């Protein structure tokens, strides 16, 4: 299984989702590898922090850039799950990964500047589907406001995804400090004791996305 987390706009939480996905699957006894294809190296730094924390399980992480198609095909024969953090830009790494990924998760914040990228992202998905028709593609609305008065913004964002042929998950993530706190020490919200709502969000998201 190759799970690709990517998109065209930075700041939507792709690295955070990649990390939490990987930890979740590891807790389910899957042999997981993280591949950081983002030039910023956020997930690589996270994995190093995690390795230095004796209270956390080690989660292997490698870096790669450019055309990573063959790299992913090789890694998929050695690990049960490869989770790819492709970062927030249209890159050769993102495009090449889309040709072999079994699952593609596209995070969007419920903001106009994020949703404007749907035009181009949907075109990339269409191109990838021509050579990788079995890839499961889902959008997810992230960093959502928790105020009840803002629910319509979330619904509108999901509708925007649908209008471009990208099926959104019912599950969302909300704007919670614990996501940033966990990222800074190599942890995940699944291992944090401070905010169980964030843990429930990730568990719901992964269960819906991967049906596990």
Give the label of every model feature segment.
Residues 145, 157-187:
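Beta-strand-loop-alpha "switch" segments that mediate conformational coupling across diverse proteins
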Residues 17:
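Hydrophobic positions on the alpha1 helix immediately C-terminal to the Walker A/P-loop
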């Amino acid at each position: 299984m190759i799970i690709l987390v990517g998109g065209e706009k930075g700041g939507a939480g792709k690295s955070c989702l990649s990390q939490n996905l990987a930890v979740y699957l590891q807790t389910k006894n899957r042999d997981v590898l993280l591949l950081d294809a983002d030039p910023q190296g956020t997930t690589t730094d996270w994995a190093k922090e995690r390795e230095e924390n004796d209270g956390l399980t080690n989660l292997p992480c490698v870096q790669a850039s450019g055309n990573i198609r063959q790299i992913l095909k090789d890694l998929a024969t050695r690990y049960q799950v490869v989770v790819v953090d492709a970062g927030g830009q249209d890159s050769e790494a993102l495009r090449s990964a889309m040709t072999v990924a079994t699952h593609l998760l596209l995070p969007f914040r419920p903001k106009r500047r994020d949703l404007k990228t749907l035009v181009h992202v949907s075109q990339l998905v269409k191109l990838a589907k021509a050579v990788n028709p079995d890839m499961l593609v889902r959008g997810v609305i992230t960093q959502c406001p928790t105020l009840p008065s803002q629910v319509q913004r979330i619904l509108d964002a999901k509708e925007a995804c649908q209008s471009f042929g990208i099926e959104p998950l019912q599950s969302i993530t909300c704007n919670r400090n614990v996501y940033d706190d966990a990222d800074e020490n190599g942890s995940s919200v699944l291992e944090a004791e401070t905010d169980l709502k964030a843990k429930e969000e990730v568990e719901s998201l992964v269960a819906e996305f991967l049906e596990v």
